[in-house]
């Protein structure tokens, strides 16, 4: 199933599988969350179906002690990611870059997740930017989108304004702090 450590000529899928499992074991040993890019990829001509988060299901099952932080809400597979985050305790939704990809998809996903996913499994903001301006702009967009989604749930009567504020803080601060083992933040 895996390449042996003493094999020098490990190529193609065997090598990819070996490296993925090596990194999962490494993350498990060190209690480090494993971040994976899914969904829309920067640039053109990517095969989007290769980034479907369901392709990772075997890893979620095999490495139950590894927390997987799934980037970009898996867009356009955000509904699938909802189901994965609901059924796997070790799968977290990361909204990094997603607010830029599609603000509407983010708001709609958050409204859905409030009904279907433990909200302490959602990181509301993050990014892998090449320039600092992206951080400020994306955070502003994230705050607006989270506010819109939570306001919808308040209007529906799912929770009150104070609970919405607590949930917002949890998604922006508490969940990432816990997931990444940040103590003095």
Model regions: which residues?
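Short acidic/histidine-rich active-site segments
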Residues: 35-37, 69-73, 96, 119-140
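Alpha-helical packing segments of well-folded alpha/beta enzyme cores
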Residues: 19-23, 109, 171-175
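C-terminal structural cap/anchor segments
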Residues: 72-124
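Histidine/acidic-residue-rich catalytic or RNA/ligand-binding cores of hydrolases
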Residues: 44-53, 78-87, 103-111, 132-148
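Active-site gating/metal-coordination segments in enzymes
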Residues: 1-33
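Mid-to-C-terminal alpha-helical segments outside catalytic/metal-binding sites
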Residues: 119-120, 136-185
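Catalytic core of soluble alpha/beta enzymes
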Residues: 33-86
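Hydrophobic alpha-helix feature that most strongly marks membrane-spanning transmembrane helices
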Residues: 28, 61-64, 86-89, 111-118, ...
């Amino acid at each position: 199933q895996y390449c042996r450590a003493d094999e020098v000529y490990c190529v193609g899928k065997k090598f990819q599988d070996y490296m993925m499992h090596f990194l999962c074991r490494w993350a498990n040993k060190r209690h480090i969350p494993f971040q994976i890019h899914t969904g829309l990829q920067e640039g053109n001509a990517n095969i989007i179906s290769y980034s479907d988060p369901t392709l990772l299901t075997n890893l979620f099952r095999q490495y139950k002690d590894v927390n997987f932080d799934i980037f970009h809400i898996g867009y356009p597979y955000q509904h699938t990611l909802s189901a994965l985050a609901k059924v796997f305790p070790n799968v977290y939704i990361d909204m990094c870059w997603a607010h830029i990809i599609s603000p509407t998809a983010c708001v709609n996903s958050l409204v859905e997740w409030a009904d279907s996913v433990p909200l302490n499994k959602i990181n509301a903001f993050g990014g892998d930017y090449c320039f600092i301006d992206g951080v400020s702009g994306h955070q502003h967009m994230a705050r607006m989108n989270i506010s819109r989604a939570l306001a919808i749930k308040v209007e529906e009567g799912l929770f009150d304004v104070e609970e919405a504020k607590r949930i917002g803080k949890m998604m922006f601060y508490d969940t990432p702090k816990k997931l990444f083992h940040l103590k003095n933040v």
